[in-house]
Every structure is written in C-alpha cells, then in structure tokens.
C-alpha cells in the first residue's frame, strides 16, 4: 500500500513554514490522540501517520530530501528512517501543550513535585438594596476554605504512620505507556499523580491532607455599583 503524502497528511501546502507545520500537527494530534479515541484503531493509525509526517517535515534536511525524492529518500535506512520517535526538539513543547489541555494543565505533575496547588475559584452571589448600591457598604460573607488538616499536618496519613512511595511510578507521579513506536507519559493511575500512596489514611481528612472549613471575609461594596458587577477577591 502506497504511503500518503506527508504534506497531505498534515493538510498543509508544500510551501508551509515551520509555524504552519507545527500548528497543523498540533491540531490533528489533539483530534486523533489515542486518549481521546480509545480502542479506535483508525484513529491510532492516523495519529502515527501524523507523527511520522511532522517528524520528517520539521527537519530541514529530511524535508529537503523528501521534496526531492519522496518516500524513497527514507527507504533502506536513508536519512535515519521514519520511526525515530521523539528525538527532535519540537515534540516536547507540542505534547506538553496537548497533554496540558487534555489533562487539565498538569496539576498532578505539580503535586508530585511538591508544588503548592492553586485553590479552586469560588463564586458568591450577593443581593443588596438600591440604597446600599448608592452609598456603598462593607458586607461580611462566609466562604468554604481549604486548609491543612491539623490531625495529620497535611501528610494525609494516620498519626503514627507515613505515606509510602508509589510502586507503580516509583514516586514520580507519572508513568509511560507504549503506543506503537512511541511512548506517552500519563498521570499514574495508582497514586493519581501524588507519587505516594497512603496505606492508613487520616481519619479526619481521609487521606487528602486538607479539610474544608468556613471563614468570614469582609467585602467592600463601592458606592455607585451597578447590577451584575463582579468584585474579585484574591
């Protein structure tokens, strides 16, 4: 079976520059990625073709050889072949973007490295009188707040016990899965990106290391505020 033209595979013209190639690859990789198309052999095959086409066309030397000789330039090991995986520098940035969008921005990776997690956004709807909107006021509101558990001091483990390194990911929070001739890094399914497992969870926070409590906040409502106005607190 004849191989598809690399330019046609990516849906770009032969005059496409590096930026156009990268944009086309990223769009198609997102569409046909195995994680978005589980058990779909056609999508997996298409993803491999997209990967191979970009691997060749992003390299100026390989692209020049392909433009001159077509697929024959890579037969019998010429120019290093077409299955070299992610040796080029362009893939790391692109796949980091792709996995970021697919996996919610890499929060699990941040947890496994010990970084502080960003709290969830909260929205509070407040009703005030017409008089208050003219004169302004200071209002007290109560909002749920995530704080460190005072029983386990944030470890998530029952007092007197300790978390253990995850045996699946060896404490990294990430695992690699083979997909044909390339591999994909994913959040560890055992520890969910933490890098640790908790055999004996804390009875108060149930292994989360944090608990939710309400706290009071003062909100200054400025004079002349209009209906639908948003006030942001950080």
From Swiss-Prot:
Chain positions of all zinc fingers (CR-type): 136-214
Primary site of residence: cytoplasm
Cofactor annotation comment: Binds 2 Zn(2+) ions per monomer.
Keywords, sorted A to Z: Chaperone, Cytoplasm, DNA replication, Metal-binding, Repeat, Stress response, Zinc, Zinc-finger
Domain free text: The J domain is necessary and sufficient to stimulate DnaK ATPase activity. Zinc center 1 plays an important role in the autonomous, DnaK-independent chaperone activity of DnaJ. Zinc center 2 is essential for interaction with DnaK and for DnaJ activity.
Role this protein plays: Participates actively in the response to hyperosmotic and heat shock by preventing the aggregation of stress-denatured proteins and by disaggregating proteins, also in an autonomous, DnaK-independent fashion. Unfolded proteins bind initially to DnaJ; upon interaction with the DnaJ-bound protein, DnaK hydrolyzes its bound ATP, resulting in the formation of a stable complex. GrpE releases ADP from DnaK; ATP binding to DnaK triggers the release of the substrate protein, thus completing the reaction cycle.
Oligomer status and interactors: Homodimer.
Name of the protein this chain belongs to: Chaperone protein DnaJ
Lineage: Bacteria, Pseudomonadati, Pseudomonadota, Alphaproteobacteria, Hyphomicrobiales
Name of the encoding gene: dnaJ
């Amino acid at each position: 079976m004849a191989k598809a033209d690399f330019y046609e595979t990516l849906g770009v013209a032969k005059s496409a520059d590096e930026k156009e190639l990268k944009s086309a690859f990223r769009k198609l990789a997102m569409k046909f990625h195995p994680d978005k198309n589980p058990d779909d052999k056609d999508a997996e095959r298409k993803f491999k073709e997209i990967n191979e086409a970009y691997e060749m066309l992003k390299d100026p030397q390989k692209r020049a050889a392909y433009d001159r000789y077509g697929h024959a330039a890579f037969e019998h090991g010429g120019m290093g072949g077409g299955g070299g995986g992610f040796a080029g520098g362009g893939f790391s940035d692109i796949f980091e973007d792709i996995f970021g969008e697919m996996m919610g921005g890499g929060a699990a990776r941040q947890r496994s490295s010990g970084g502080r997690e960003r709290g969830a956004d909260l929205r509070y709807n407040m009703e005030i009188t017409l008089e208050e909107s003219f004169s302004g006021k200071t209002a007290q509101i109560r909002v749920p707040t995530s704080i460190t558990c005072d029983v386990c001091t944030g470890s998530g483990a029952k007092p007197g016990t300790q978390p253990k390194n995850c045996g699946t990911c060896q404490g990294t929070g990430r695992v690699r899965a083979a997909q044909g001739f390339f591999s994909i890094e994913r959040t560890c399914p055992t520890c969910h990106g933490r890098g640790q497992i908790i055999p004996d969870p804390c009875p108060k926070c149930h292994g989360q290391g944090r608990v939710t409590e309400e706290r009071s906040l003062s909100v200054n409502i400025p004079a002349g505020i209009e209906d639908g106005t948003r006030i942001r607190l950080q």
